[in-house]
Amino acid sequence: MTEYKLVIVGGGGVGKSALTIQLIQNHFIDEYDPTIEDSYRKQVTIDEETCLLDILDTAGQEEYSAMRDQYMRTGQGFLCVYSITSRSSFDEIASFREQILRVKDKDRVPMIVVGNKCDLESDRQVTTGEGQDLAKSFGSPFLETSAKIRVNVEEAFYSLVREIRKDLKGDSKPEKGKKKRPLKACTLL
């Protein structure tokens, strides 16, 4: 059975733990208890393939940022989560992505941009279009989710697994700075 190492990143209070617990335990946690680092495992079937999701729920608070490099090194794919009710959490996503790319020394890493708390439409500070544009600029899928009313929760994690699978199939591509040289044929006369 294939195991996928998923890492969920984003600012404090955007709902990373709520999304993860909704996926794993099918319930919504409404009290805010800042995470330092939690790990969850769940066996699921995605596109008729049974696999094991190893999900690392990370700290959003800046005081734990020193821990980020380590989990970014080991993760295969990343859910970059912001809250649609927080402009600042949206603005942080680009720096999370840059840090991931730097740590992994790659131009592209399997990633999905997630706008959480879509049930709080009246408090929206970030439009759906802004989220779509950001994800498009990254070459990543985009979803709006709600851990509270369970909108697109499974789809967010499953889409990330599909991105990892695509990446693994194309893994023979050269990494940043390492270009494959074309084969040259010589003709002797």
UniProtKB/Swiss-Prot annotation:
PROSITE patterns associated with the record: RAS
Gene field: rasG
List the S-geranylgeranyl cysteine lipid attachment residues: 186
Q: Is GTP-binding tagged as a keyword?
A: yes
User: Which Pfam families does the protein's record reference?
Assistant: Ras
Topology versus the membrane, per the UniProt entry?
A: Lipid-anchor
| Position of sequence motif Effector region | 32-40
**Binding residues annotated for GTP, in chain numbering:** 10-17, 57-61, 116-119
Top-level taxonomy: Eukaryota, Amoebozoa, Evosea, Eumycetozoa, Dictyostelia
Organism from which the protein derives: Dictyostelium discoideum
Protein's UniProt name: Ras-like protein rasG
Write out the similarity annotation: Belongs to the small GTPase superfamily. Ras family.
Which E.C. number(s) belong to this protein?
3.6.5.2
- Segments of this protein annotated with the region Disordered: 169-189
Name the InterPro entries for this protein.
Answer: P-loop_NTPase, Small_GTP-bd, Small_GTPase, Small_GTPase_Ras-type
Q: Which reaction does it catalyse?
A: GTP + H2O = GDP + phosphate + H(+)
A Gene Ontology cellular component where this protein is annotated is: cell cortex
Effect of changing residue 61 to L: reported as: Constitutively active
Q: Select a single GO molecular function from the record's annotations and give it.
A: ubiquitin binding
Quaternary structure, per UniProt, is: Interacts with ripA.
Location of this chain's protein in the cell = Cell membrane
Propeptide, chain numbering: 187-189
Entries under CDD domains matching the protein: H_N_K_Ras_like (cd04138)
- Cysteine methyl ester modification sites are 186
A GO biological process of this protein is: phagocytosis
Q: Which residues form the signal peptide?
A: none
